[in-house]
């Protein structure tokens, strides 16, 4: 497929606001794609992805490299490109204008194809070490040299993972279902166990719904993790379930462990491979866990038998060098509470049976443990378990329905959580503002947004400026500086990449923001770099928490 055909289709999508029309247009486009490799790439590219989230490959191309490539191909200086970004607010549109100027004097000698873009991306992702940056710039310059102005717009946005089409996972799922006459729920399940929409589309095209139903969980391909809803209270949660399985809720990082007898891989909640950062846990898994399993659990940092704050776990996850030193400095424990695979898929079994399989697969050790669990219909026993968890330094309890299956990616009432502190929100940072006085060289406030999971759009809910130390602001400024795509006065706009956990006094209705809601007195709690943008809290959750405030007040 010519990349021009893809770009022209994206331009048409950009003008459509109706979810139903977007779904129908994408479905019709997918039906026409004959080459399976093109189909795979187009599905990912439309959703702004180059690789599935669990794939360790990444382009490693920041705005700085794009500036250099665009400067090379257009002859326009970087300072002028930055000025154009302030005018257009979108590097994709800037690239389009730059290539438009260039193409007035240059004849294209080769047409760009989707395959060529994919092959170049794969080569860029493979580059490491000395000279890799120069080679990346050369390859990017080559792509822009072949691109038409419109192709340059969407090529740039794709590299930045921000297509601006309003097409989220939900729309693409429904489009695949419509294109290849499959049940959307079957497509959803296939996606949740593979986390690869491109692969799902190819199977749907080749084998139809029957092929999708045959797709099974595979060791070393992460499964989207099941999530919990917030319970109104311990009492209401137990009442709703009648009999409940109750476990401690840990203040750590969610992990999914895959162990086939020869290799262990560990994935974070964002489905990133964090195996190399956790060599101590890997070795203990090999000693304490039977092979042929996928386990769901939480890793916590411990000191003298007490849990340490969540940030310590993240320091372990982030560490790329001197890992052995960090193992000594921040010891970890893994607490497992579920099993997804035991010599075959077992997510459709009820929790009570999965727990038995889990117990048979894990021999507890100093670092590998089973989450403590009781099954009861007594509110008093649940309260006692909750108090024990808080006394031990944990967050609260998880209350689960013993008869429930494990539904990948699902947040529902089969799992409920009760925490000691007021519920917080995990929100995407989409903008910021430079400070004043001695803080003028730091970003001092950050604009926050929740996720519309259907369209993939980020809906603003407010701005946070409190809860930061000076060290926080210095570190966050360095993190966000490369992500700035436009600036008006002191206000800047970021490529969405990071998630903040934010506390607040209450949620209010507000016409000021596209979400329709605003946070009152928001306060920064911590950076959630264990969460991807797609894992941020949704507009539905904001609405539910807004309504829950009134339920609590009535009580």
From Swiss-Prot:
Top-level taxon: Archaea
EC number(s) stated in the UniProt entry for this protein: 6.5.1.1
Active site positions: 249 (n6-amp-lysine intermediate)
Xref: HAMAP family: DNA_ligase
Catalyzed chemical reaction(s): ATP + (deoxyribonucleotide)n-3'-hydroxyl + 5'-phospho-(deoxyribonucleotide)m = (deoxyribonucleotide)n+m + AMP + diphosphate
Keywords assigned: ATP-binding, Cell cycle, Cell division, DNA damage, DNA recombination, DNA repair, DNA replication, Ligase, Magnesium, Metal-binding, Nucleotide-binding
Annotated PROSITE patterns: DNA_LIGASE_A1 (PS00697), DNA_LIGASE_A2 (PS00333), DNA_LIGASE_A3 (PS50160)
Cross-referenced InterPro entries: ATP-dep_DNA_ligase (IPR050191), DNA_ligae_ATP-dep_bac/arc (IPR022865), DNA_ligase_ATP-dep (IPR000977), DNA_ligase_ATP-dep_C (IPR012309), DNA_ligase_ATP-dep_cent (IPR012310), DNA_ligase_ATP-dep_CS (IPR016059), DNA_ligase_ATP-dep_N (IPR012308), DNA_ligase_N_sf (IPR036599)
Gene Ontology process terms (BP): cell division; DNA biosynthetic process; DNA recombination; DNA repair; lagging strand elongation
Family membership: Belongs to the ATP-dependent DNA ligase family.
Cofactor: Mg(2+)
Role description: DNA ligase that seals nicks in double-stranded DNA during DNA replication, DNA recombination and DNA repair.
Residue sites binding ATP per the record: 247, 254, 269, 298, 337, 411, 417
CDD domains hit by this protein: Adenylation_DNA_ligase_Arch_LigB, OBF_DNA_ligase_Arch_LigB
Full protein name: DNA ligase
GO MF annotation list: ATP binding; DNA binding; DNA ligase (ATP) activity; metal ion binding
